[in-house]
Amino acid sequence: MLQLFSFPFSAMASACAVHLYGDDQIGVEAVAEAAMAEVARIEQRYSRYRSDSVLADINDVAQRAGSTAVDDETAKLLDYAYACHQRSDGLFDITSGILRRVWDFKSGQLPDRKAIDDLLPRIGLSKLSWQRPQLTSLQ
């Protein structure tokens, strides 16, 4: 009979857990360790809180009107982000993250309208040019 094994860990400033069914604890632990290692790898590469992440490089390019070449994994993520933007008629937009500067989602309060309006000119995929593997800020 299969048994449920749980492996709690922390990642991306959150409590996480891997839950796996198996009959061999050692085998299940190996799979859980591989999953947790992959989460750590993704966090290292794409965390907005790490100054050494790929995402930090991309955000730096967006702020200084520069350009950067990205690796294949990041290119696939950008391809997907652009596809989601298109399919959602622009509702999904990776450039909207700048709103975190004025929007404290934990407070339950809306930010000042002027604070939002001041950031809106910096939001929109039209501010970027994506020609694989080159991402360029047009601002």
Regions found by a protein language model. Name each.
Residues M1-Q139:
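A contiguous, well-ordered beta/alpha segment that forms the leading edge of an enzyme domain
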